[in-house]
Regions:
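Membrane-embedded helix bundles of polyisoprenyl
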Residues: 122-139, 143-228, 240-263, 268, ...
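Membrane-interface coil-to-helix junctions
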Residues: 24-132, 151-173, 266-271, 278-302, ...
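A cross-kingdom signal targeting lumenal/periplasmic-facing segments of multi-pass membrane
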Residues: 101-106, 513, 517-656, 663-665, ...
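Periplasmic/ER-lumenal interhelical loops and adjacent helix-loop junctions
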Residues: 46-60, 64-66, 100, 240-331, ...
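Active-site-proximal, structured, solvent-exposed surfaces of multi-pass membrane proteins
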Residues: 7-8, 647-911
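Start-transfer (signal-anchor) and selected internal transmembrane alpha helices
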Residues: 1-32, 239, 243, 426-431, ...
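Extracytoplasmic/lumenal acceptor-recognition loop(s) of multi-pass membrane glycoenzymes
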Residues: 82-84, 91-94, 446-469, 485-556, ...
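Contiguous transmembrane helix-bundle modules in multi-pass membrane proteins
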Residues: 190, 209, 325-343, 347-476, ...
Length: 911
């Protein structure tokens, strides 16, 4: 300890830091391992995080193989195995590409990725501590204070909760201290290299957190300017602003090779453009629990504070000092204001849904407050100690005043806070030497961290149930669904669809198949637009599992196989008659059925439908129109005549208990209430339930009780309901709803997201395919999972005859692309057409594709909203498509230019 508290040696500091970090990290890891759990979150961790890391490792090894073995440089930019076919950079950037630490995956075999995944979780947290300590030492803070501040920073709610689910959520904790230190260096007229590179790496690492870093970068620079310079002028402010903008621009230019393609993709997503609900204030219970949650429970909207109670003692010490640390006091007030006002969470979350995922930055502030307050502990006056005592009493009373705030975790935090304040105010009386107080505060800090960890991973909290079992995560990606398709032994280029047979999304990416499932943060806007206009039964923009078994959509997407699990033959779509492969046993067995009339990757139309005419059509007519003509903005082909043979079926409604009807609305006051639609559907048809502009509003406990019933209740019972009502929005208000639709043993669910839901993308139109029926459907039963009011413009039952689909499919496939080969960033094939036609490729449209017909570049158009087409003259043709990530070349040029400017700056500084 004596060597540790000495002023000169930092080696001992990092040895002690590493030792304590290792002990606490082992304690965290043991909570998982001791319960047979891995650190892989089942929901997103398996299909996204772990899957992406394994993919990236293979990707890097393949690139190195082409360089050192094949002696050529090929960077794959497009992969048909990701969803319907996706850009690799823009899809995986959010998870792995750009993060320097994930480069380690190149050394780890795919089957050992889980080990690397878990190591990286703790390595990121460790580096965050190193980064914070470097920032503290730059500002000449003592090692004792820096040591404790570092532990406060890295072992808070954000890391023990959020970073375990999303490992890369620790990355901004590494970058922010370095960026802020870079700002300080510029103000001190030191070299700007740290600022430039910390900014560039954070921009390349993750666009989402980089946006937040930019906001805090600006706030910090403004605070530091007024804190450093006593003489100020508009000219001086503008001078510094120009300087910072210049260095910032250089950093962005360096990062542009990754940042530019990703940010341009982001701007095109529905999720980015959706208008989310932003309340003026949070609900009352949020404020009632706020103070206690800072050192205890997790708040809503990702406000996972959970800081050690020792940190709050540092806040009290800081505020007891008059006329000192004004910048930190104002910063503390500002960031607390951000947490208290929903609009701040809206802005800091990229003007999306309200979320406090920026709270890791609050953690740096509160940790640094403790670092600055620590030396003050030894010089506190009696008056200042009294102030600290009053603040402590006030805090404890307010933190535990509300019943909802008096949880075991919050009370434990308050107890540690009282002990910490007692320790702080006892110096000079009980503690006569600083080393003893340092030791006790450090012990309290570690105990506080351990308590927070223990509670977060307790059986009561049940947090660990969300994580996969040890060494099973990668096995789950080897799905029987993909194995059944591979067992068919088909070497062609095709897709498979499924219903209820896929345990996780994105398994095709791991198994090397082509599917209709996708689940990542960014999605191709052309796919999203198509699904929206087709009313595909999913509320997500970037998460889709299948095509709902819709025959026409399967045909147009070149789906050749349909997979079912167990004995779920009732979900097998029309036209899939022959079993071609299977995998697994019992209920987990999956069977792949072939459609012998499936369309290939490229098929042809002899006529087109102008986009302007297509947009006027009803959803069912749009679907049928796609079999008659290709939808293009303009074309020299003749216009198609659309043959619509669907029929809107008249029905009557039969309501069950807890379900009441009014014009355009269904009021549900009982979970599980049912509404029955009775009708006579067409024979030999697919049957759809279509909801136009479907929306949902939940009902509070008070709203569920009718006025007549309310008047009959006693005052006590009324008060009980009102008490529950006051807490309802925080705890139980549903931001989503589900309608289960059943017909002929087929059961499917329509999910509705409200504008309060974090994945809301603005979708309110749904078509639920209840499957093919030879004899005709007679009823559909809707079961409402949530109480509330379901509103709609139209609720329709439609029968879609399948008789003409086969004939139209055959026509589209008569003159098709043959000898299709998928190369690195390349698709090739041959085709012969007897007349002028449009060749449609069932590959998602992207500006990154360039088409060549017989070696000559040819205009490639967006077709059918989602796919691509090129017009062909009569005769035989060689088709070649090449791909380059949109804006990648511009990004590379900017990066080269940025590096050139950086080198020029270096030489200029040397001179």
């Amino acid at each position: 300890m004596r060597r540790f508290v000495s002023r000169d040696s930092k080696k001992d500091f990092y040895l002690l830091y590493t030792l304590v970090f290792g002990v606490i990290s082992f304690f965290i890891y043991y909570q998982f391992a001791g319960n047979g759990k891995s650190l892989v979150w089942s929901h997103d961790g398996i299909p996204q995080h772990l899957n992406s890391l394994a993919y990236y490792g293979r990707y890097l090894r393949e690139v190195l193989h082409t360089i050192f073995v094949e002696h050529k440089l090929e960077l794959p930019m497009w992969d048909m195995n990701i969803g319907y076919g996706s850009d690799i950079l823009t899809t995986l950037h959010y998870y792995v590409i750009g993060d320097p630490l994930t480069l380690l995956s190149v050394f780890v075999p795919a089957d050992k990725t889980e080990v690397l995944y878990e190591v990286l979780i703790f390595l990121r947290i460790y580096l965050a501590g190193i980064s914070f300590s470097v920032f503290c030492f730059y500002h000449k803070n003592p090692k004792q204070a820096t040591f404790m501040g570092t532990l406060i920073y890295i072992f808070a709610g954000w890391t023990i909760y959020a970073a375990m689910k999303h490992p890369y959520f620790s990355n901004p904790m590494i970058y922010l201290p370095l960026v802020l230190m870079g700002i300080d260096k510029i103000y001190k007229r030191e070299k700007p290299w740290l600022f430039i590179w910390a900014t560039a790496v954070s921009a390349m690492s993750n666009f989402y957190f980089f946006y937040m870093i930019c906001i805090f970068m600006f706030i910090y620079a403004a605070f530091r300017y007024f804190g450093i310079f006593s003489e100020r002028s508009v000219k001086d402010v503008l001078g510094w602003l120009v300087k910072f903008i210049g260095y910032y621009a250089v950093a962005l230019m360096i990062a542009a090779v990754i940042f530019l393609p990703v940010i341009m993709t982001l701007f095109g997503t529905d999720r980015f453009q959706a208008e989310n609900y932003v309340p003026l204030l949070y609900d009352k219970i949020y404020y009632e629990k706020y103070l206690g949650d800072l050192i205890g429970e997790n708040m809503i909207q990702w406000g996972v504070a959970g800081y050690s109670a020792v940190a709050m003692a540092g806040v009290f010490v800081l505020f007891s000092r008059k006329k000192k640390y004004l910048d930190l006091k104002l910063g503390f007030g500002l960031l607390n204001l951000f947490l208290l006002v929903p609009f701040a969470g809206h802005v800091l979350n990229g003007f999306s849904y309200v979320s406090n995922r920026w709270i890791w930055a609050y953690g740096m502030m509160i940790a640094y407050i403790f670092v600055k307050a620590y030396p003050e502990l030894f010089t506190l006056t009696v008056r200042e100690k009294k102030k600290i005592f009053v603040m402590t009493v006030a805090y404890c009373v307010l933190a535990l005043f509300a019943k909802a705030a008096r949880t075991q975790r919050n009370m434990a935090g308050v107890l540690v806070l009282v002990l910490a304040v007692f320790t702080v105010t006892s110096f000079g009386n009980i503690f006569l030497q600083g080393k003893y107080m340092c030791g006790l505060l450090s012990a309290l800090l570690v105990v506080s961290i351990m308590l927070n960890v223990s509670y977060q991973y307790s059986y009561e909290k049940d947090y660990l149930s969300e994580f996969a079992a040890e060494e099973e995560s990668l096995d789950k990606l080897e799905s029987n669904t993909d194995k059944a398709v591979l067992a068919a032994g088909d070497s062609g280029v095709y897709r498979y669809d499924q219903y209820g047979a896929l345990p996780y999304d994105n398994t095709s990416m791991y198994m090397g198949t082509n599917s209709t499932a996708y689940y990542f943060s960014l999605a191709n806007s052309s796919i999203s637009d198509f699904f929206s206009e087709m009313y595909l039964n999913t509320p997500w923009e970037q998460h889709y599992e299948n095509l709902d078994g819709r025959t026409i959509l399967d045909r147009l997407a070149s789906v050749k196989y349909f997979v079912i699990s167990g004995d779920n033959f009732r979900y097998l779509s029309y036209g899939y008659n022959k079993e071609k492969g299977s995998a697994g046993k019992g209920k987990s067995e999956c069977r792949a059925y072939e459609n012998e009339n499936a369309l290939p990757l490229g098929y042809t139309y002899d006529s087109y439908i102008p986009e302007s005419e297509y947009e006027k059509m009803d959803v069912v007519k749009k679907q049928q129109a796609l079999m008659d003509g290709v939808v293009l903005e303009e074309s020299t082909l003749p216009e198609a005549s659309v043959d619509a043979d669907n029929e809107n079926i008249q029905y009557r409604m039969e309501t069950g208990d807890g379900c009441a009807l009014s014009k355009g609305a269904i009021r549900v006051t009982k979970e599980g209430a049912q509404l029955k639609l009775v009708f006579h559907g067409l024979t030999d048809s697919e049957n759809y339930l279509i909801a136009d502009n479907l929306d949902y509003d939940s009902l509070s406990p008070r709203e569920l009780i009718g006025n007549s019933q309310w008047k009959k209740m006693s005052e006590y019972d009324q008060n009980k309901v009102l008490d529950e009502d006051s807490r309802w929005r925080y705890w139980k208000e549903s931001k989503e709803a589900a309608m289960t639709v059943s017909s002929n043993d087929v059961t499917k669910t329509i999910k509705i997201f409200t504008d309060k839901y974090n994945a809301y993308s603005g979708r309110h139109d749904f078509l639920c395919n209840m499957g093919y029926s030879r004899s005709g459907v007679r009823t559909m039963t809707i079961t409402f999972a949530n109480t509330g009011v379901y509103t709609y413009d139209k609720l329709r039952v439609v029968s879609q005859p399948v008789q003409g689909i086969e004939e139209k499919t055959v026509k589209l496939g008569e003159e098709a692309l043959e000898n299709v080969k998928m190369g690195t960033n390349e698709i090739t094939g041959d085709i012969s057409v007897s007349e002028k036609k449009a060749l449609v490729l069932s590959v998602p449209y992207s500006k990154g594709f360039t088409a060549y017909v017989d070696g000559k570049e040819t205009k490639l158009q967006k077709a059918n909203t989602m796919f691509m087409a090129l017009e062909l003259e009569p005769g035989s043709h060689e088709i070649r498509l090449t791909y380059c990530t949109p804006y990648l070349k511009a990004g590379m040029l900017l990066s080269v230019l940025g590096l050139v400017i950086y080198v020029m700056l270096v030489f200029r500084k040397k001179k």
